[in-house]
Amino acid sequence: MPESQSPNSSTNAPVTGTTHVKRGMAEMLKGGVIMDVVTPEQARIAEDAGAVAVMALERVPADIRAQGGVSRMSDPDMIDGIMQAVSIPVMAKARIGHFVEAQILQSLGVDYVDESEVLTPADYANHVDKWAFTVPFVCGATNLGEALRRITEGAAMIRSKGEAGTGDVSNATTHMRGIRTEIRRLQSLPADELYVAAKELQAPYELVREIAETGKLPVVLFTAGGIATPADAAMMMQLGAEGVFVGSGIFKSGNPAERAAAIVKATTFHDDPEVLAKVSRGLGEAMVGINVDQIPQSDRLAERGR
């Protein structure tokens, strides 16, 4: 796998980050909540609530879903404004396969690029070559094979997709359970059957063997999509997530500041029902949302970029 390269003015060689550094940045976010924000004010609310990072974007997934149209990378001025407003890491989204959007985001100095299915894909056949960048990438996955393909492309962090902008956590649970189940299956296979498993997963044998031996992905695994309550966040942590992305669920709710703080606390104390009961009180109305089963398969964001 590519290692660090120094800038070279005579050859114009690309500057890339080491695997250790990129994955290490995600390790520092483990156990935390990353929140979607569309304004500097929202970013400050997220930081005050205890978010470990924010995701800067012009429209939260619920609005993207409701308004339709083509969704693209956010305006650099908007991203700059959020970066200046907070001291925690700032992430931003690029379209699947849009390597120039990723180049722009890297030049802005964001801490992470999310090659995101929430935006309209720029390339339905190819993802960004993430090894070519200094900035680390996070990518979504609905199953283990998808996760391994993104890691092979250079992703330094994976999030189970769920179905963004719905407030319905059912797909998040399905995807997380599925990934964990597939990992346990690899652990149970004899060594000689891992070759067939690698073919089925469309992933390199060496990576499949590593997961069979360690029982986990080589990168941090967060969860996303439909998380709207403290209980949702705690459930996903108990299912094996190492952290939580929350999008529309906070700033589409009745009391964003309190809900944000409650979800952070629920993520930290996910195995303590008494704390969960306490932080779930008096939060006001959660986002109304939409049931995933009411969305046609062809319109589901999680189906993009598989």
Swiss-Prot record:
D-glyceraldehyde 3-phosphate binds at residue 177. This is Pyridoxal 5'-phosphate synthase subunit PdxS. Pathway: Cofactor biosynthesis; pyridoxal 5'-phosphate biosynthesis. The gene is pdxS. It comes from Salinispora arenicola (strain CNS-205). Keywords: Lyase, Pyridoxal phosphate, Schiff base. D-ribose 5-phosphate binds at residues 36, 165, 226, 247-248. InterPro entries: Aldolase_TIM, PdxS/SNZ, PdxS/SNZ_N, RibuloseP-bd_barrel. It catalyses: aldehydo-D-ribose 5-phosphate + D-glyceraldehyde 3-phosphate + L-glutamine = pyridoxal 5'-phosphate + L-glutamate + phosphate + 3 H2O + H(+). Belongs to the PdxS/SNZ family. In the presence of PdxT, forms a dodecamer of heterodimers. The keyword Lyase applies.
